């Protein structure tokens, strides 16, 4: 299907619908990377050149041949200590203390279906949708093996990579660095696209030329972080949204990560993505195996929009799982900005009644329903219902709300513990703290040691008792601080704790998914601080940002869209003046922006005017009409909100049968000029009727002539145009 081994050339070729990836086992057993790009045929080893380079070491096997050096050859798994002085994929500390490895080809296996990773999220596929290539490399001196895993999904133009490290030696070793994916390019004038940010302003696009030296992103916070998203794009110099070559790497992992792009002395480029090497030293006893997380790769020569669509399809259909993989999500209202910690069962019931009258599907009770939790200084870890505060049982409240025809959800933060809590008084050792040091607090809370099974078991027992005794249909899983004081009392090997913590998190989430298959879980870490493909394996949507300001959200959701589908972006209409920025935007505009996400409300419904309530009912009706298209259609960025006074995007049906064009005017001026937006992805030969005016346009006209936008008075106006093919 998609993987071919040629014995004559000793090449492995991975073919997708539009791309080719090729590597070769050379005469010394090194696995060299030959090519990744637009589909091509034949052996590509002619691209390799060999010259005598000063100060470049030569493998002993090469004898007197000074033209052969790992320092200039493209590789699939570069190793520290074998003559390659660039940043390496693999760094091992051997039993004798030496820091070197020299991986040579041993064998391979090709099989139908997609590999999985024990304890880790990974792309999944049916046997007829994917193939797996396993290549085993071995260090002849130690017997340590590296198994390289390649998953090929031909129809999606997706290739996945991962690696196992198996200690087949007789001594304990340490994995000090392991990158899950490496791409080496022999030439090219590239730009690096990364997505930086901060709390409440995540995933801002940065595009910089790849210069000599290393450019690095990463996180040491224990999460993928608000500061850098674990995704990188390498683009040819002139690549645009619609034209040009570009490569993506997206990490299917939610903890510390490291992404690096470097240009070497010979103008070659290396791209690496994997677990953060800082504070990482993973022990492997004889016979043990370390499993590295997965990286999703994609390439296209058709610009950034197509690259994003490849990733969107992969995440929607081969990362997200369960009932809500394809099902439209409920429209919900979250109690946080309506009540914060100040509520009773009766106030929540009244909010649910108002929600029902407006057509909202679900009420979500946010922070404050458990333990002694009237502010953010106490109660975390005590996951029992505060019935005194509610004035009734949670099960009773949920039943009353359900009787209105409204579903019910709750907020949880299972990874955290307050020092003022029953759990901390009983199990202070469950918190991540360093003996002899006072802990670093953040939001007045500490982090539980999820690297320990008994801690995960204890918290899961509490949470499941709540879920078992009330009809909870949604959970918002929050995580409101970074990891510090990382020390586990259960091991002397502290270099493994950060990684094992994430495995504990995944174990907890996997138990929830299996025990409650119809439960919708929304991920959150102070908004978008853990927005990655790893979390999406368990939570099909993630709260995009704690910043719900509609204009800031244009930029946040724009950056997020490069790697993640609209169906994954938690987005709500919130009150004005906005609680994060103080900005006032029209209710209609807030609705249009939130519809390019999971859509819901984050405000006090009881304070809305009758006119606003009518607008909310209208928004919900429009969303229900567009929801299948929004959730499953092809997303196109039409403008850059950082550079244009207009932010425009569209979603096109997979059969080009309909399109929803969305526009927000970011700036207004006196004597306004008219802006035009050119649509993308339509059938040029087809006719499309705009559903509000009834006017008919050709697909070619909309794509090449464009659509004139109103030049109206008023700040931050928004427009939606729904076109249906005749």
List each language-model region with its residue ranges.
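Conserved, mostly hydrophobic/aromatic
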Residues: 18, 163, 287, 333, ...
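Polysaccharide-binding surfaces and accessory modules of carbohydrate-active proteins
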Residues: 5, 9-14, 21, 31-262, ...
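Catalytic cores of secreted or luminal carbohydrate-active enzymes
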Residues: 588-637
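Active-site neighborhood of glycoside hydrolase catalytic domains
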Residues: 391-393, 426-427, 431-586, 598, ...
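C-terminal beta-strand-rich structural cap/linker in extracellular carbohydrate-active enzymes
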Residues: 699-726
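Carbohydrate-binding surface patches
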Residues: 241, 640-683
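Short Pro-Gly-centered flexible turn/kink motifs
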Residues: 98-105, 282-301, 717-723
